């Protein structure tokens, strides 16, 4: 999927912006506060239904306006898709797919795979396991059609089982508790099979990328499924039942899964510098882009915010080259032109200048 045109209304300082990006790489230049990152934020809304800068949608709406809207025309296999999203100040959402309106964000975002690399991207390695689970699940959402149904079912069952744990009058042997635990084990095992299969695909891609991005290190990658080795999930749930009943929540299962990175037996986070961690993240994100292309023939839209702050000149060039090899459409922001000195070699490119919320294409 490639963006042919983008329209943005009342999003931060972008009051009325329309531009036609290149299907290759788009460089967006502007000083801090000009609105260049808000362009990426608008595209991110189409791919995720939310901002990467704030959890409060009303903060994104321009002052004295009731809502913001992002609309795009996309090209896929010579077919044009018209997609739109609007969020109001009272937090309601409306999506539009080829003129048909609804409020199911997942229908929209499934059509437009978007990834983003920002100054906060290292959080996937430094933050909680939830962020690394999201990494796997993003790829599964776009590759496996039945994944979302399974994941949502597991989340609902986990919430219900946690509630049962907190009900002192419901003991573990109670038939109601046994029934819901069995269902949890069923969907949890299915979810784990999805993730195991995806990691089997991703690990060779990540390893290959690291050979180019961090050749001086041997990074060991492993997937922890969320419970003890040698046990089925229903056995692990039975084994932990007394503890879970006492604590009031389920302590084992795919909601405790993690992806672990080690170098010489030590966590990679303790060995690598901040810049090296960014290159590990770049290898991870490139791998999901490659996986998407290999297994679905879908292309990804990739947002690279503040390229000068995140990657040195040589690394940013290699990263962009590899993304373009996967037929990715890129949007790259920078503050100063010297951060983009390497761009002359790219044929399929456009340069945009942003100033006070106005976007101008360089001829």
From Swiss-Prot:
Keyword match Transmembrane: no
Spell out the molecular function terms from Gene Ontology. Answer: ATP binding; single-stranded DNA binding
The function of this protein is: The RecF protein is involved in DNA metabolism; it is required for DNA replication and normal SOS inducibility. RecF binds preferentially to single-stranded, linear DNA. It also seems to bind ATP.
Q: What is the lineage of its organism?
A: Bacteria, Pseudomonadati, Pseudomonadota, Gammaproteobacteria, Alteromonadales
**S-S bridge residues:** none
Q: Which residues bind ATP?
A: 30-37
Under the heading InterPro entries, the entry gives: DNA-binding_RecF, DNA-binding_RecF_CS, P-loop_NTPase, RecF/RecN/SMC_N, RecF_2
**Localization:** Cytoplasm
Q: Which UniProt keywords apply?
A: ATP-binding, Cytoplasm, DNA damage, DNA repair, DNA replication, DNA-binding, Nucleotide-binding, SOS response
Which NCBIfam families would you find in this protein's record?
Answer: recf
One GO CC annotation: cytoplasm
What PROSITE patterns does the record point to?
RECF_1 (PS00617), RECF_2 (PS00618)
Question: Which GO biological process annotations does it have?
Answer: DNA replication; DNA synthesis involved in DNA repair; double-strand break repair; SOS response
What is the recorded name of this protein?
Answer: DNA replication and repair protein RecF
Question: What is any Pfam family matched here?
Answer: SMC_N
- Please classify the protein's predominant subcellular localization into one broad category: cytoplasm
Q: Which family does it belong to?
A: Belongs to the RecF family.
